[in-house]
Regions:
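N-terminal leader/targeting and accessory segments in enzymes
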Residues: 1-92, 96, 240, 293, ...
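Phosphate-binding loop of NTP-binding sites
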Residues: 10, 89-237, 241-251, 308, ...
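Short glycine-rich anion-binding loops that position phosphate/pyrophosphate groups of nucleotides
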Residues: 43-44, 182-183, 205-206, 239-240, ...
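Active-site beta-alpha connecting loops in nucleotide-dependent enzymes
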Residues: 43-46, 334, 358-361, 365-428, ...
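Receiver (REC) domain switch/active-site residues of two-component response regulators
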Residues: 61, 196, 402
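Acidic, Mg2+-coordinating active-site environments of NTP-dependent enzymes
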Residues: 69-76, 177, 195-349, 372, ...
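Short acidic-hydrophobic, aromatic-tinged amphipathic segments that line or gate anion-handling sites
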Residues: 80-85, 434-438, 442
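Glycine/aspartate-rich loop-and-adjacent alpha/beta segment that forms the canonical ThDP
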Residues: 455-488
Length: 494
């Protein structure tokens, strides 16, 4: 990308500046160099304005800081400007810098506690099957569909979001499906993006360490719907909050797995009597765009909902209903989302990202209809995060699985024994579960004890390829561990 002129960039905010060339925008002073515009704002944990002098010392071309009437900027040898409400305007600033890439794309925003990654990948997969070139941004990675690069956060900074969109547009993407987290919405990271469609999947307990209450968490999610015209909103009518929002947004598209949606005059998309089998599901689709049978190679009732969410977004964007039905059997299962390993002579192990009580319950319920033997659940909880959901996670495992193994997830700086104690507190019969802190050994234990008719849900990490113990982020993958343990098990049969 050619350099941008400082004066042109600042003119959008009524600031007069000289025509210095800018090559990048940085929020982290450690990444600043010649050509950088250092943007100094108050973060959730740290005030970036404390590092203005460090950025200047590292060669920054200019500084733009958050003006609040109290902060006094240091005297610098480079241009240094203050701007009120800078965090809320950062998406706009980055949009101007990167020449508004989202205006040249179909941009689908997806929010909700569960299902964001799967829905985003299904949208991108569908666009690819129909002959386009689609990008993905979210927890599972950023990049063109089929070539994702690991992402640090579900929704990056406002600057990262615009930079990623620009990169995808330059690579030829004509559609981008983007997970939008509640954090990202509250922190205005997508405030200036012209979304073509917005999807709400569901709301259940998560991130209360940040939002405080479920009401605040739900209000954060609703911000995405406010960024699109009402007919471009796609809302889950099976979700309690979704039903409330459909009353407030009567022109939105409603989708659901439980048949016709009552008291909604807008467009609808529903599944009727889905049939589940080992290869996926088949279901009758009734919609405002037409009716037909949809088959997809995905496990579980909640994936019927995810497919409907993705299909709703595609229909809002103008894609053909019959073409979507015809291509649905070619949709690809998502890495680390109800991903199957083994089977046959060995137990079937299913790796899934379920890390909330609601997601864990849905995953276990989904697998129960496929299970001829015992249903196992291996699960842990992260450290330095919402303690309130730990007993709920254990309770869900105990309620819906026949055999439970509790193990470590990402303990971070918290004592694994304390995390485990919080989980055990949610059990009715603590003596009925097994505890193995070492996640590798826990997976090996489950596979060694299960029969070939059994299904083992390995929950919590999904696609992740790391484990955080203390402050050490080390390589670890449930998918790799399960595959290796199954290989060893199969060798023992020969």
């Amino acid at each position: 990308m050619p350099p941008r002129a400082l004066d042109q960039l600042m003119s959008h905010f009524g600031i007069t500046a000289s025509a210095l060339p800018l090559t990048d925008i940085q929020l982290d002073s450690r990444r600043v160099g010649p050509g950088s515009l250092f943007v100094a704002i108050r973060g959730h944990q740290m005030d970036g304005r404390r590092f203005i002098e460090q950025a200047v010392a590292q060669g920054a071309t200019a500084v733009l800081f958050e003006e609040d009437g109290e902060f006094v900027a240091p005297v610098t040898s480079i241009p240094c400007f203050g701007l009120k409400d800078l965090p809320a305007r950062l998406s706009e600033l980055a949009g101007h810098f990167y020449d508004h890439p989202a205006q040249k794309l179909q941009l689908v925003g997806i929010t909700g506690t569960n299902g964001k990654s799967t829905t985003a990948l299904l949208v991108a997969n569908w666009r690819t099957l129909l002959g386009g070139k689609a990008g993905v941004m979210g927890t599972i990675g950023n990049g063109l569909f089929g070539n994702l690069i690991e992402a640090e956060n579900t929704t990056g900074s406002a600057v990262q979001v615009q930079a990623n969109l620009a990169a995808l547009q330059q690579q030829g993407a004509d559609l981008v499906a983007m997970e939008v987290s509640s954090h990202g919405l509250v922190q205005h990271r997508v405030a200036a993006l012209p979304f073509s469609a917005a999807v709400f999947t569901n709301l259940s307990r998560d991130h209360l360490d940040y939002h405080g209450t479920m009401e605040a968490y739900g209000a954060a999610k609703e911000e995405l719907l406010k960024l699109v015209d009402e007919p471009c909103a796609v809302i889950n009518a099976d979700d309690r909050l979704g039903r409330q929002w459909l009353a407030a947004y009567p022109g939105a598209v409603a989708f659901g797995v439980h048949g016709p949606i009552e008291n909604h005059a807008g467009r609808q998309l529903t599944a009727q009597d889905p049939h589940f089998h080992q290869q996926g599901f088949d279901t009758r689709i009734n919609s405002s765009w037409g009716n037909g049978v949809l088959s997809a190679p995905l496990l579980g009732r909640f994936n019927v909902s995810n497919v409907l969410a993705a299909m709703g977004a595609m229909l809002v964007l103008g894609y053909d209903f019959d073409a979507l039905l015809a291509s649905a059997p070619k949709l690809q299962p998502v890495t680390g989302r109800m991903e199957c390993f083994g089977g046959g002579k060995a137990p079937l192990a299913v790796v899934d990202y379920a890390h909330t009580p609601d997601a864990l319950e849905k995953a276990l319920q989904a697998l129960r209809v496929h299970c001829e033997g015992r249903l196992w659940c291996l699960v842990g909880c992260g450290g330095d995060r919402d303690r309130g959901k730990r007993p709920m996670m254990a309770a869900m495992a105990e309620q819906h699985a026949d055999c439970v193994i509790l193990t470590d997830d990402n303990p971070r700086t918290e004592a694994p024994e304390q995390i485990m104690a919080d989980m055990v507190a949610g059990l009715r019969d603590p003596g009925s579960v097994q505890i193995e802190h070492d996640r590798v050994k826990a997976i090996q234990l489950a596979l060694s004890q299960a029969s070939k008719q059994d299904i083992i849900l390995v929950a919590g990490k999904g696609h992740e390829d790391y484990q955080i113990i203390g402050t050490d982020k080390r390589h670890y993958s449930d998918r790799e561990t399960v595959a290796a343990a199954l290989h060893t098990l199969m060798e023992s049969f020969t």
